[in-house]
Structures are given as structure tokens and as C-alpha cells.
């Protein structure tokens, strides 16, 4: 018997037909651009939060298959949010992508060391964002832990 993953479909965490992506960004214009880009694939239900605290609340309610996070937001920044999610066993393995205008290598390292799976910069290409979503949804917990350890070792070696 064939299963959906043989045809490139990735099962979601809840068993629904559509995978759910939570976008957390305080800029409504950017949120609309991200929603448009993600909806180009037609495979995702997109839900939104406009700051880190609201985003944290929505994660527990919505149980998304992937979370896209901005860094600079009111009430809780993206790095704090990522650390909070990685510190909670209920959200430890939720795929996280930072999408930020902060482009320095140090910003990216802070993101990865906070536990995000992918760090993309604005402006972004819809194809790159969609590829990142597909990639992080496929990561296993062991893949995620191995990547964080490698990044931490590489970062420590440069200090």
C-alpha cells in the first residue's frame, strides 16, 4: 500500500488535511506578504499573532506544524519566544523559522542558539520560505538536537 509521503506530502502533527503555519510578526504588511507567499503552495492553513506573548498563547491553542517568527516584536522578542518553546516539553519539537530584517551573522547565531531550525532574512523569496517550511517540518528531534550542538561547537570555536 502506498502512503502520502511517497508523493511528497508531509503528514501534519494533528492528522488534518491541511498543515498549519503560525506567523508571529508585529507588522501587518509583512504578515500579509508572508501569508501570500505561504498560500502560493495551497497546502497550509495560516494563522497569525502580532507579538511574542500572543504567539506563545496561539501555539498552545493552534498546535501548528511550523512557526514563523520575527525577532523584534513587542512584549517578547523572537529569541525569547524560541527559548521558551524549546524549554517546554510540549513545544520542544515544533519547527521554528525566524524571518527577520536582522541580517548580521551574530543575529543568525543568536537565533540558532535560541533553538530555531532556520533563519531567513527579509526581504525574502516566497520559494525560499516555502522550501524552509518543508525542510523544517521533516526534521526529527534528533536532527534538531544534532544541528544545535554543531552550531554551538562552531560558535564556541570562534570566540
Q: Predicted regions: what is each one?
A:
Residues 48-66:
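Acidic, metal-coordinating helix/loop segments flanking the phosphotransfer/catalytic sites
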Residues 13, 138-159:
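CheY-like receiver
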Residues 124-134:
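C-terminal output helix
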Residues 28-47:
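Two-component/phosphorelay signaling modules centered on CheY-like receiver
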Residues 73:
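Receiver (REC) domain active-site loop signature in two-component systems and cognate sites
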Amino acid at each position: 500500500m502506498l502512503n502520502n509521503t511517497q508523493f511528497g506530502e508531509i503528514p501534519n502533527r494533528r492528522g488534518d488535511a491541511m498543515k498549519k503555519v503560525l506567523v508571529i510578526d508585529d507588522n501587518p504588511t509583512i504578515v500579509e506578504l508572508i501569508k501570500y507567499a505561504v498560500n502560493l503552495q495551497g497546502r497550509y492553513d495560516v494563522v497569525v499573532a502580532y507579538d511574542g506573548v500572543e504567539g506563545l498563547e496561539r501555539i498552545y491553542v493552534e498546535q501548528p506544524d511550523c512557526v514563523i517568527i520575527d525577532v523584534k516584536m513587542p512584549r517578547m522578542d523572537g529569541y525569547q519566544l524560541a527559548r521558551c518553546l524549546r524549554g517546554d516539553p510540549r513545544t520542544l519539537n515544533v519547527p521554528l523559522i525566524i524571518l527577520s530584517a536582522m541580517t548580521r551573522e551574530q543575529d543568525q547565531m543568536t537565533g540558532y542558539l535560541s533553538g530555531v531550525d532556520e533563519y531567513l532574512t527579509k526581504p525574502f523569496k516566497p520559494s525560499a520560505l516555502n522550501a524552509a517550511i518543508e525542510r523544517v517540518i521533516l526534521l526529527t528531534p534528533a536532527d534538531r538536537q544534532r544541528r544545535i550542538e554543531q552550531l554551538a561547537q562552531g560558535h564556541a570555536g570562534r570566540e
